[in-house]
Curated annotation (Swiss-Prot):
One of its GO terms (biological process) is proton motive force-driven mitochondrial ATP synthesis. InterPro entries: AAA+_ATPase, ATP-synt_VA_C, ATP_synth_F1_bsu, ATPase_a/bsu_AS, ATPase_alpha/beta_chains, ATPase_F1/V1/A1_a/bsu_N, ATPase_F1/V1/A1_a/bsu_N_sf, ATPase_F1/V1/A1_a/bsu_nucl-bd. It comes from the Eukaryota. It comes from Yarrowia lipolytica (strain CLIB 122 / E 150). The record marks 384 as: Required for activity. F-type ATP synthases have 2 components, the catalytic core F(1) and the membrane-embedded component F(0), linked together by a central stalk and a peripheral stalk. The central stalk, also called rotor shaft, is often seen as part of F(1). The peripheral stalk is seen as part of F(0). F(0) contains the membrane channel next to the rotor. F-type ATP synthases form dimers but each monomer functions independently in ATP generation. The keyword Repeat does not apply. Belongs to the ATPase alpha/beta chains family. It catalyses: ATP + H2O + 4 H(+)(in) = ADP + phosphate + 5 H(+)(out). This is ATP synthase subunit beta, mitochondrial. Its EC number is 7.1.2.2.
């Protein structure tokens, strides 16, 4: 029993060596991996998404290898090896439905993990977990292919310098800055502007950094994925005629758990290629990271593992770490991840969100209360946090301005009950001044988005970090106390506030 278990470990190690020597798989290499015919077997058992396949003694496939079943008319079902059961039998997880499979059907070993197309040919396309296009726009034009399972960059390859990734969004850059190569949790309910916020980030990264983005729908509703695709076409993020800025990777809610558990790795592999081979600063969106954990839990149960706390898989921390550790900055480029986080029953101690929080560098909270005020982006300036808001990283001036903005907003929040009961007249002169400045800051945190221009009619603004810090410093110092609140709403820099105030004054005469 020891030898069959040892063989796959050795072959997997050999594959990692080959992968290190030739990180980018081109088409001929990929063809050789599948046509060399490492081995073939026959289906022994089918139980839902789990398929047991029996091989010859010398041809047992390695753990994580992709197996294929020809279903006719060019359709292939992909299986991923999960366990070796003994008696030359492997237990696999199907990446698609297993309806119609029968015992005795022939199964081919590709000799490598699931391998997907990468590079610019994927931009503007929608692909599934196996890298196949699902947008009915023909095959993907790609010359490079990579396996979805890879080791994270070595310590020597990683860049350990904490750098701020400028997004051009004032509230984010000032109060909860994103780390280049960091991981950000995006919290928000339905209808608070999560999709528009994501689209603006994609647009700004393309403009400011020339970088690409990968949107990964893990356990997405098919309708939401379709809506996102249509909105991206309307706003120009996806350009069917020219080069698009984003690749969409979907493992929908109705798909088997195997596909949902692996689709995040597919999206990450595409992002890694842009980072490592093209030196890009890439944005990777994962919606929803909880569904990744949920799918892993389903797979674990199907494989017969004993569950741990709350029914989650015993390998929860390992699975999450394997994904998150690959999201990092290297000497060549970076992958910065924005992950929507669903919190089951609003219980932050649930193992799934609790494991996710351990990896996050920043949290961006979208608030319904702020969106009801008509302030967009509806980012909560007091709830959103970042480990990069540190004097050693952002500098003394930025840190002081951000702290004073938060203190002013917190003071206004604590005075709101008094104002609601007694009115503004009962406040001291200092408190009145604090409230006036806080209301101006609150409105100045709003910003017209380029992707929302078709709805608002206001041209989008991308504000540099330097201008953002200077503008808020001037408001805190009282330089613009004489200007009306309305002038601070939906503008870019402070110069626009002054110009808008003059325009409002002229119109009122």
């Amino acid at each position: 029993m020891v030898l069959p278990r040892l063989i796959p470990r050795l072959s997997r190690s050999a594959f990692k060596v080959a992968q290190a020597n030739n990180r980018v798989f081109n088409a001929p290499f990929r063809g050789m991996a599948s046509s060399a015919g490492v081995g073939s077997g026959k289906i022994r058992t089918v139980i839902g998404a789990v398929v047991d396949v029996q091989f010859e003694q010398d041809n047992l496939p390695a753990i994580l290898n992709a197996l294929t079943i020809d279903r006719g008319e060019g359709n292939k079902l992909v299986l991923e090896v999960a366990q070796h059961l003994g008696e030359n039998t492997v237990r696999t997880i199907a990446m698609d439905g297993t309806e119609g499979l029968v015992r005795g059907t022939s199964v081919a070993d590709t000799g490598a993990p699931i391998t997907i197309p990468v590079g610019r040919g994927t931009l503007g396309r929608i692909i599934n977990v196996c890298g196949e296009p699902i947008d009915e726009r023909g095959p993907i034009e790609a010359t490079k292919f990579l396996p979805i399972h890879a080791d994270p960059p070595t310590f020597a390859e990683q860049s350990t310098t904490a750098e701020v990734l400028e997004t051009g969004i004032k509230v984010v850059d000032l109060l909860a800055p994103y780390a280049r190569g960091g991981k950000i949790g995006l919290f928000g309910g339905a209808g608070v502007g999560k999709t528009v916020f994501i689209q603006e980030l994609i647009n700004n990264i393309a403009k400011a950094h020339g970088g690409f983005s990968v949107f990964c729908g893990v356990g997405e509703r098919t309708r939401e994925g379709n809506d996102l695709y249509r909105e991206m076409k309307e706003t120009g993020v996806i350009n069917l005629e020219g080069e698009s800025k984003v690749t969409l990777v979907f493992g929908q809610m109705n798909e088997p758990p195997g596909a949902r558990a692996r689709v995040a790795l597919t999206g990450l592999t595409i992002a890694e290629y842009f980072r490592d081979e093209e030196g890009q600063d890439v944005l990777l969106f994962v919606d929803n990271i909880f569904r990744f954990t949920q799918a892993g839990s389903e797979v674990s149960a199907l494989l017969g593992r004993i569950p741990s706390a709350v029914g989650y898989q015993p390998t929860l921390a390992t699975d999450m770490g394997a994904l998150q550790e690959r999201i990092t900055t290297t000497q060549k480029g970076s992958v910065t991840s924005v992950q929507a986080v669903y919190v089951p029953a609003d219980d932050l101690t649930d193992p799934a969100p609790a494991t996710t929080f351990a990896h996050l560098d920043a949290t961006t909270v979208l608030s319904r209360g702020i969106s009801e005020l008509g302030i967009y982006p509806a980012v909560d300036p007091l709830d959103s946090k970042s480990r990069l808001l540190d004097i050693d990283v952002v500098g003394q001036e930025h840190y002081d301005v951000a702290s004073n903005v938060q203190q002013t907003l917190q003071a206004y929040k604590s005075l709101q009950d008094i104002i609601a009961i007694l009115g503004m007249d009962e406040l001291s002169e200092q408190d009145k001044l604090t409230v006036e400045r806080a209301r101006k800051i609150q409105r100045f945190l709003s910003q017209p988005f380029t992707v929302a221009e078709v709805f608002t009619g206001i041209e989008g603004r991308l504000v540099s970090l330097k201008d953002t810090v200077r503008s808020f410093k001037e408001i805190l110092d009282g330089k613009h106390d004489a200007l009306p609140e309305a002038a601070f709403y939906m503008v870019g820099g402070i110069e626009e506030v002054v110009a808008k105030a003059e325009k409002l004054a002229a119109e009122s005469k």
